[in-house]
């Protein structure tokens, strides 16, 4: 019995150890790189000068950590082939509108993505970080300043003008 009591006491004491402290270092918001490669994209009759995201690293970073998006700025994400896509608002500090485009540049779906508040210090712990799905095959995604899709009256099926051939050839 003394052995059992000793084991219970040991288990109780060892389970009370504090977890090591965790240092949370928030990401520092950044401004767009003025030297980033851009391309002109026309949405709803309005020209935008969008940064390119052609490879996995660029697509993963996307517009994360930005404090602002220029009125005519944003990013175009190009993929090698049409596929089901899903984007999240990871480390995003401003609202972003997303347009998913098929291989011909037609709008498949759009979303007004809102800033996600951290839960427990981490945005990814917030269930609202779940993906915004393309709901169909898409080869491109375009992200612009929040509110512009509605302001421009963009709808599913609309054509977005972008250098399709170049983007398809360069997507990795």
Question: What are the language-model segments listed below?
Answer:
Residues 17-172:
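Compact, glycine-rich, soluble single-domain proteins
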Residues 1-3:
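Bacterial N-terminal signal peptides that target proteins for export
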Residues 12-15:
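C-terminal motif of bacterial Sec signal peptides marking the signal peptidase cleavage site
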């Amino acid at each position: 019995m003394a052995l059992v009591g000793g084991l219970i006491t040991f288990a109780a004491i060892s389970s009370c150890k504090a977890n090591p402290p965790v240092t949370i270092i928030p990401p520092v918001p950044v401004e767009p790189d003025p030297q980033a490669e851009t391309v002109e994209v026309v949405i709803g009759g309005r020209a935008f000068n969008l940064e390119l995201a052609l490879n996995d690293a660029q697509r993963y970073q996307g517009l994360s950590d930005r404090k602002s998006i220029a009125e005519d700025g944003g990013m175009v994400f190009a993929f090698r082939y049409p596929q089901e896509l899903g984007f999240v608002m990871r480390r995003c500090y401003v609202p972003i509108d997303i347009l998913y485009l098929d291989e011909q540049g037609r709008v498949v779906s759009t979303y007004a993505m809102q800033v996600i508040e951290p839960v427990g210090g981490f945005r990814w712990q917030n269930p609202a970080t779940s993906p915004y799905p393309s709901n169909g095959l898409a080869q491109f995604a375009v992200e612009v300043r929040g509110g512009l899709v509605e302001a421009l009256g963009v709808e599913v099926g609309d054509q977005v003008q972008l250098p399709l051939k170049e983007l398809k050839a360069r997507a990795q």
